[in-house]
Curated annotation (Swiss-Prot):
One of its GO terms (biological process) is iron-sulfur cluster assembly. Homooligomer, forming a rod-shaped structure 24 nm in length that may arise through a double-helical assembly of subunits. Interacts with CRY4; CRY4 seems to be associated with the outside of the rod-shaped homooligomer. Does not interact with CRY1 or CRY2. One of its GO terms (cellular component) is mitochondrion. The gene is ISCA1. It comes from Columba livia (Rock dove). Its main location: mitochondrion. Involved in the maturation of mitochondrial 4Fe-4S proteins functioning late in the iron-sulfur cluster assembly pathway. Probably involved in the binding of an intermediate of Fe/S cluster assembly. Component of a putative magnetoreceptor complex formed by ISCA1 and CRY4, a member of the cryptochrome family that are known to be required for light-dependent magnetosensitivity in various orgnisms. The rod-like assembly may facilitate the perception of the Earth's weak magnetic field. Both ISCA1 and the complex with CRY4 have magnetic properties and are attracted to iron beads. This is Iron-sulfur cluster assembly 1 homolog, mitochondrial. Residues 1-15 form a transit peptide. It is found in: Mitochondrion. Detected in retina, especially in the retinal ganglion layer, the inner nuclear layer and the outer nuclear layer. Detected in retina visual pigment cells (at protein level). Keywords: Iron, Iron-sulfur, Metal-binding, Mitochondrion, Transit peptide. Fe cation binds at C60, C124, C126. One of its GO terms (molecular function) is 2 iron, 2 sulfur cluster binding. NCBIfam families: iron-sulfur cluster assembly accessory protein (TIGR00049).
Length: 132
């Protein structure tokens, strides 16, 4: 389990229209910028083996993703290994992430992980919560 309940960084979600769910090797794929950012975040945290993605009930649309550092793989976690990065998906979040791409986006005002999810039926205005 993660040693801290605080999130790693801010994350938002985007509904991806006109995209069919396609079988992939993993429930979640990472863009090169997401891989690079996770490596940067873990560089100074040798006691942590990766990040864990979870889902919580909150926000104006029902569900929201969480990101935490983790020291180990939980018994029911799904592990995604890509380009030397380990991402663990909590059991409760596994079905909500099928076919999802995890990206890291920076602009002049903000930086955040973005989950491009083809399964989402709706999001709130700020993009932090969603429903499936």
């Amino acid at each position: 389990m993660a040693s801290s309940a605080s999130s790693v960084v801010r994350a938002t979600v985007r509904a991806v229209s006109k995209r069919k769910i396609q079988a992939t090797r993993a429930a979640l794929t990472l863009t090169p910028s997401a891989v690079q950012k996770i490596k940067e975040l873990l560089k100074d945290k040798p006691e942590h083996v990766g990040v864990k993605v979870g889902v919580r009930t909150r926000g104006c649309n029902g569900l929201s993703y969480t990101l935490e550092y983790t020291k180990s793989k939980g018994d029911s976690d799904e592990e995604v290994v890509q380009d030397g990065v380990r991402v663990f998906i909590e059991k409760k979040a596994q079905l909500t992430l099928l076919g999802t791409e995890m990206d890291y986006v920076e602009d002049k005002l903000s930086s955040e992980f973005v989950f491009n999810n083809p399964n989402i039926k709706g999001t709130c205005g700020c993009g932090e919560s969603f429903n499936i």
